[in-house]
Amino acid sequence: MFEKNGRTLLAKRKTQGTIKTRASKKIRKMEGTLERHSLLQFGQLSKISFENRPSSNVASSAFQGLLDSDSSELRNQLGSADSDANCGEKDFILSQDFFCTPDYITPDNQNLMSGLDISKDHSPCPRSPVKLNTVKSKRCRQESFTGNHSNSTWSSKHRVDEQENDDIDTDEVMGDKLQANQTERTGYVSQAAVALRCRAMPPPCLKNPYVLNQSETATDPFGHQRSKCASFLPVSTSGDGLSRYLTDFHEIRQIGAGHFSRVFKVLKRMDGCLYAVKHSTRKLYLDSERRKAMMEVQALAALGFHENIVGYYSSWFENEQLYIQLELCDHSLSALPKKSSLKVSEREILVIMHQIAKALHFVHEKGIAHLDVKPDNIYIKNGVCKLGDFGCATRLDKSLPVEEGDARYMPQEILNEDYEHLDKVDIFSLGVTVYELIKGSPLTESRNQSLNIKEGKLPLLPGHSLQLQQLLKTMMDRDPKRRPSARELLDHPMFDRIRG
């Protein structure tokens, strides 16, 4: 009886010990979990080994051993869950640790902050997904974790190499497609692109027909591109849209006029000097008209500076008109008799002949013929005669069309279209100019007077030496071969009186 009661008492005590053991384990588990959770909150989480934690209920009695042996069954049922809890492998606390219920809300991978003084400015911000540009991508194979570390390292490198090769192949495919598309559209140029290119293209480089050596100046760097957009080239240029003439010059008064142009005395605003600006009276719409008007500019530019030739400075098209900036002279030779009631002396005539002969010699040496020598085209500045108005200038080799000047000063061969001696035409015109200057009155349109002059039949000129009259007859000879050249005229002994 006592043995039976002792067994019953022992069983009750055993059950109570099991309950106490379970309760103590639960308490220790919760304490460890709370401690780790608090350490996580303060960024001081360290690996805590629960195996080294001292137990508060350690007993060495046999009774405790019985209790431990009886609870082994319960430990086997708990399995790996209890062992994991005892080893402290959890780094965070879940709601089921408190309420023993499954947690379906808390995500498995929580991004917990690791410190109290972390600023919000440094926290990562969510970004919108980036669109992938690759055509295809490979999925990384899941490697087995049973292999050694070297195998996993090699497999990861192999995957990276495969991905890089795949990206290279993709880039090559895209590059080939772009190149193919560009090749297909190589021959096509849109009208908008052509118009834009023409607006950005500089004006054309005109060929100067009066320049002998054009090895460098005849090259137009944009010539091969202008053929595509010739219709888009402007017929005139005016800088930034404003009038260059009104912007750069102050017009003073008109000093000359002709059939095709007018000449104004102007003051240049930039340098404060006086110039003569000549511009066409009518608008030049056609390309042939513009090229014809440009002949004077090109001839003056090809000649360059000479003391007995009117200086050339600049030219431009504006409002379909050609503007030429020239040297300003005092007056023309035709105005000389009007300025003085006295007739021109023979010495003054020799000075005029000598200076214009020097100008003609310089022009002829350049391979150019003036073809419009007359009193209106000879100017005087500070007592120096200057030859101007090269609108009818042409080449001596007949490479350019011949346009005759004033018919009153032209020899008969020009009227007969004989252009073999164009330099002698200028000598004839100079003789007629001097004859008109000695006479003191302009030539008339009288048929008889015109025929006598073209035949070289001059009346006597009282008050002048026979030597001068004979020189004039030689210069106005009907046969151009018997006329002196400009060089021969300069060497004539009559000019010895004015030399030195």
Curated annotation (Swiss-Prot):
Residues 143-155 have a biased composition (Polar residues). CDD domains: PKc_Wee1_like (cd13997). Induction: By replication blocking agents (hydroxyurea and aphidicolin). Residues 249-495 form the Protein kinase domain. GO terms for cellular component: nucleus. Coiled coil: none annotated. Disruption phenotype: Plants show no obvious cell division or endoreduplication phenotype when grown under nonstress conditions, but are hypersensitive to agents that impair DNA replication. The keyword Metal-binding applies. Its main location: nucleus. GO terms for biological process: cell division; DNA replication checkpoint signaling; negative regulation of cell cycle G2/M phase transition. It catalyses: L-tyrosyl-[protein] + ATP = O-phospho-L-tyrosyl-[protein] + ADP + H(+). Expressed in shoot apex, vasculatures tissues of roots and leaves, and developing flowers. Residues 141-169 are annotated as: Disordered. Cell cycle regulatory kinase that is not rate-limiting for cycle progression under normal growth conditions. Transcriptionally activated upon DNA stress or damage in an ATR- or ATM-dependent manner. Once activated, inhibits plant growth by arresting dividing cells in the G2 phase before proceeding into mitosis. Down-regulates CDKA-1 and CDKD-2 by tyrosine phosphorylation. May target principally CDKA-1. This is Wee1-like protein kinase. It comes from Arabidopsis thaliana (Mouse-ear cress).
